[in-house]
Structures are given as C-alpha cells and as structure tokens.
C-alpha cells in the first residue's frame, strides 16, 4: 500500500539519557535522533534505539514517552509491504558504545560505521531504490536535507518533496 512517509527529528533526551549528552558533544550538534514515520491508520514510526532491533511503534506511544518532535521532512509516498516490515525487523542492532567509539576514534582508523538511526534511514531508502548518500550523524542528515542541492532526497519518481516545520 502507498503511504506518506516523513523523516522526523525528535528530542529523545528522556530515552537516550547519558548517550544524548555524549552524542551532542562528539558531533557538536543539537540533533541526536531521527526516524521514519508513516501515515498509516493508525500512524506508525520505525525507530532504532540502543541494543534492540528496529521497533515499529504507534505515534500515540511516542507522545507517551515524552519525546518532542521539532522537525519533519516529507519524503512523499512509499509503497509499504511485508518486505519492508521484514527489512525493519532484520536490520542490524544499534549499539551506543560502538557509535561513541566510532565518533571518538574509529572514524580516524577507517572503522566501518556503526548502525544508528541515520544509517537506518539511508539504508532503508536505498532498499526502496533511492540514490541517497551514506550519512552517519543526525547533523549530517540535517545538513543534507537543508542543502541547496538536495536533489538526492527526491524519490525515484523524481518528485522534489519539500521540507516543512511541524505545526
């Protein structure tokens, strides 16, 4: 089924705890978490958090977790099927320790990027046939979405989906 999809940036401080502070310091950025949301009935979000496979949760549960959405980027309509849900459930687990090690030392020694919320978004869109860059930090994603030449964030049908602030 075709559903509208968005990349959403959230303040995940209540869930990230000490990882929130370290990621902010190591990336010199206020952006620490992003995930995909789909306008299904009811709306769902696919999030990746420390030590767990990707989780599919309802939008209502996000509000109960006391996390705050501060920006969304509409990426248009995507076909959502059983293959997508299998992809979500089989995506590699995120490890905060690996992410922090990568930020502090690993990137200087050619370490493979650890899985995180942004690599999940990029990998999923590549799975859907998009030509998107390999990004790692929420700051890189934010800058790429807001670049003057953000043509890479067009769907395979080449629609340019513009960003908008969450009301």
Question: PLM ranges: what are they?
Answer:
Residues 3, 38, 49, 73-78, ...:
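Intrinsic-disorder/low-complexity regions
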Residues 3-76, 104-112:
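Glycine-rich catalytic cores of cysteine/serine-nucleophile enzymes that process amide/ester linkages
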Residues 57-61, 81-84, 117:
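Amphipathic alpha-helical interface surfaces
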Residues 94, 99-167:
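Activation targets extended, charge/polar-rich intrinsically disordered C-terminal tails
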Residues 76-101:
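A structural motif
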Residues 43, 77-79, 140, 144:
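Acidic/proline-rich low-complexity IDRs
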